[in-house]
Curated annotation (Swiss-Prot):
Reported function: Probable ion channel inhibitor.
Tissue specificity remark: Expressed by the venom gland.
Protein name from the UniProt record: U9-hexatoxin-Hi1
Protein family per UniProt: Belongs to the neurotoxin 03 (Tx2) family. 03 subfamily.
Amino acid sequence: MKLYLVILVTSVALAAASPTRTKEEPIEDELLEALLSVEKSLFNEETTVMEKRSCVIGWKQRGQKCERDCECCGVAATCIGERMPGFCGYRTTNNNLGQYILYGYSTVSNGVSAILCAA
C-alpha cells in the first residue's frame, strides 16, 4: 500500500512539474507557416521555375552540357555521358542501398575532381 502511495505521489508531482503545452505552440505555428508557404510555391509558377542553389557562378546546372564532374552544381552531381560533352545530372538506381552507396561514391569522386580541377 505504501508503494502505491509513493508511485501516485511521484506521478502527480511529475505531472505538475512537466512543461506546459504553450511553449510548443510557436514551433507548431512556424511549421504550419512553412508548410503553407511551400504549398503556395507549388502552385506559383515563378517559384517552381527558380531553384535555390548555392553554386559558384559559372557552374553548370542539371541538364547542361559539361566535360568534367567539377563543372556541375551539386555535391553528388556528375558529368554523365559516353561521349564528350556529357550533361550534368545525378546517377540513380532503383535499389535504396545502392543509391546511398552511389551518392557517397559520387560525393567522394566530386571532392577529388574539385581538387584536380583547381590545380
